[in-house]
Swiss-Prot record:
GO molecular function, one term: amino acid binding
Pfam families from the UniProt entry: OTCace, OTCace_N
Pathway info: Pyrimidine metabolism; UMP biosynthesis via de novo pathway; (S)-dihydroorotate from bicarbonate: step 2/3
SUPFAM superfamilies: Aspartate/ornithine carbamoyltransferase
Record-listed carbamoyl phosphate binding positions: R58, T59, R108, H136, Q139, G264, P265
Cited HAMAP family: Asp_carb_tr
Protein name: Aspartate carbamoyltransferase catalytic subunit
One GO biological process term: 'de novo' UMP biosynthetic process
Function: Catalyzes the condensation of carbamoyl phosphate and aspartate to form carbamoyl aspartate and inorganic phosphate, the committed step in the de novo pyrimidine nucleotide biosynthesis pathway.
Keyword annotations of the record: Pyrimidine biosynthesis, Transferase
Entry's Gene Ontology cellular component terms: cytosol
Naturally occurring in which organism (per UniProt): Jannaschia sp. (strain CCS1)
Family membership noted in the UniProt record: Belongs to the aspartate/ornithine carbamoyltransferase superfamily. ATCase family.
Length: 314
């Protein structure tokens, strides 16, 4: 096993070998979830604190279930009623929590880099559950596991990521991971929703679905992140769906066995046709949710192993 990280702050810090180690461990948990659900309780005696400064349904629930499956004592902090609302800084929050000696901190924050700032102030393992537009590493890992299970490999695939790339931490983490695993990545969307400097990311950029989806193995749709927009990026949702919403006609140029992905939450009729999202022969959207629990179990288990080793050596 090769996984030498103290925290999981982003895909950028992971090697190809570490990614494979995480996915292999997650696949073991995924199979156990479909069978005995016996994971051995490797986190028994450890405390996991979930701190979500942004709203979340899937990610927070997934981390909570993952921790409980592994035997951790899980605490969800209500950030809306915490001392942060009274003016406490993130650093003071980190120092306060550190004094309580937690073992795992799962953090989502609206500002890029905030999770790294917190990790520098605590003695436990920190997991980035999404920080601003920066990264969402466990989403990219669960997407990778979903792809690997559906396609039998995670290399030399044509992967299209379509939609609001500019505001998406999911896109950034997936681009980093899929690039490290030697895939061909295509970004599709209106130029107003492409980040500056995207031409230097080692990807292909298209503003036309027919060209971008041609011969693709994987089609990953992203929602319009209106909460991060500060201007008019599209003429209207109707026009956006006409040009960039995934439907059967647009998908027809992809490979016959191409899979459809979406990190959620979905806006049906905006970035994807509802019938296509529910197509059991093409859509792996529910599998993504399922793999999320397995991936988060693997990440926390490996970080906990490293944490225990460091404490034993101290």
């Amino acid at each position: 096993m090769t996984f030498n990280q103290h925290h999981l702050l982003g895909i950028e810090e992971l090697s190809q070998t570490e990614i494979t180690t995480l996915l292999d461990r997650a696949n073991v948990h995924a199979e156990a979830e479909r069978g005995s659900r016996d994971h051995g309780h490797p986190l028994r005696g450890l405390t996991q604190i979930n701190m979500f400064f942004e709203n979340s349904t899937r990610t927070q629930a997934s981390f909570e279930i993952a921790g409980k499956r592994l035997g951790a004592d899980v605490m969800n902090m209500a950030m809306q009623t915490s001392s942060v609302k009274k003016g406490e800084t993130l650093i003071d929050t980190a120092l306060t929590l550190n004094a309580m000696h937690p073992d795992l901190l799962v953090v989502r924050h609206p500002h890029s880099g905030a999770v790294k700032l917190l990790a520098d102030k605590v003695n436990c393992a920190v997991l980035n559950a999404g920080d601003g537009r920066h990264e969402h590493p466990t989403q990219a890992l669960l997407d990778a596991l979903t792809i690997r299970r559906a396609k039998g490999r995670l290399h030399r695939l044509n992967v299209a990521i379509c939609g609001d790339i500019a505001h998406s931490r999911v896109a950034r983490s997936n681009i980093l991971l899929l690039g490290k695993m030697e895939n061909r990545i295509r970004l599709i969307g209106t130029p107003t929703l492409m980040p500056s400097g995207v031409a230097d990311w080692g990807v292909e950029v298209y503003d036309n679905m027919a060209e971008g989806l041609a011969d693709c193995d994987v089609v990953m749709m992203l929602r319009l992140q209106k909460e991060r927009m500060d201007g008019a990026f599209i003429p209207s949702e109707r026009e956006y769906y006409h040009r960039f919403g995934l439907d059967a006609a647009k998908l027809s140029v992809a490979k016959d066995d191409a899979i459809i992905m979406h990190p959620g939450p979905m806006n049906r009729g905006v970035e994807i046709d509802g019938l296509l999202a529910d197509d059991i022969n093409r859509s792996v959207i529910q599998e993504q949710v399922e793999m999320g629990v397995a991936v988060r179990m693997a990440v926390m288990e490996l970080l906990a192993e490293n944490l225990r080793d460091r404490r034993a050596a101290a």
